[in-house]
Swiss-Prot record:
Domain observations: A Gly-cisPro motif from one monomer fits into the active site of the other monomer to allow specific chiral rejection of L-amino acids.
Gene that this sequence comes from: dtd
Protein family per UniProt: Belongs to the DTD family.
Protein name: D-aminoacyl-tRNA deacylase
Major localisation: cytoplasm
InterPro entries according to UniProt: Daa-tRNA_deacyls_DTD, DTD-like_sf
Organism for this UniProt entry: Teredinibacter turnerae (strain ATCC 39867 / T7901)
Function: An aminoacyl-tRNA editing enzyme that deacylates mischarged D-aminoacyl-tRNAs. Also deacylates mischarged glycyl-tRNA(Ala), protecting cells against glycine mischarging by AlaRS. Acts via tRNA-based rather than protein-based catalysis; rejects L-amino acids rather than detecting D-amino acids in the active site. By recycling D-aminoacyl-tRNA to D-amino acids and free tRNA molecules, this enzyme counteracts the toxicity associated with the formation of D-aminoacyl-tRNA entities in vivo and helps enforce protein L-homochirality.
Length: 145
């Protein structure tokens, strides 16, 4: 599993020109599910995402997590994150989970996040989405299982 997290002052996701998820200050998480991912992977990644310290403390150091700040979390599926780009000029998706498995694991990932954090919004799995954000910093990290 690959989760690209971005610290944002606001973010939203639209499907068919309708906003289906939005947050104020917090994290936008783009999620790519890979073939080898399982429930154990999901649990570890959910914990890491919620506890990863990317927000400034009173001294300006990145020392606070999303759990600490209580900020929003917008989770958007993005299968292209699982692409292998090491060879050639076209991405290979051979390591991406098949759509049915990816949907199931993505839904379980979101459920794990919601069980631990009160403010979780999502996009729509498999939909053509438009994501809007204001990246704060910019602060962006790739979390990998």
């Amino acid at each position: 599993m690959k989760v690209l997290i971005q610290r944002v002052t606001q973010a939203a996701v639209d499907v068919d020109s309708i906003t289906i998820g939005q947050i104020d200050a917090g994290i936008l998480a783009l999620v790519g599910v890979e073939k080898q991912d399982n429930r154990e992977t999901l649990g570890r990644m959910a914990q890491k995402l919620l506890k990863y310290r990317i927000f400034p403390d009173s001294e300006g150091k990145m020392n606070l997590s999303l759990t600490d700040t209580g900020g929003g979390l917008l989770v958007v599926s993005q299968f292209t994150l699982a692409a292998d780009t090491r060879k050639g000029l076209r991405p290979s998706f051979s390591s991406s989970a098949p759509p049915d498995l990816a949907r199931s694991l993505f839904d379980e990932f979101v459920a794990a996040l919601r069980a631990q954090h009160p403010n979780v919004e999502t996009g729509r799995f498999g939909a053509d989405m438009k994501v809007r954000l204001i990246n704060d910093g910019p602060v962006t990290f790739m979390l990998e299982s």
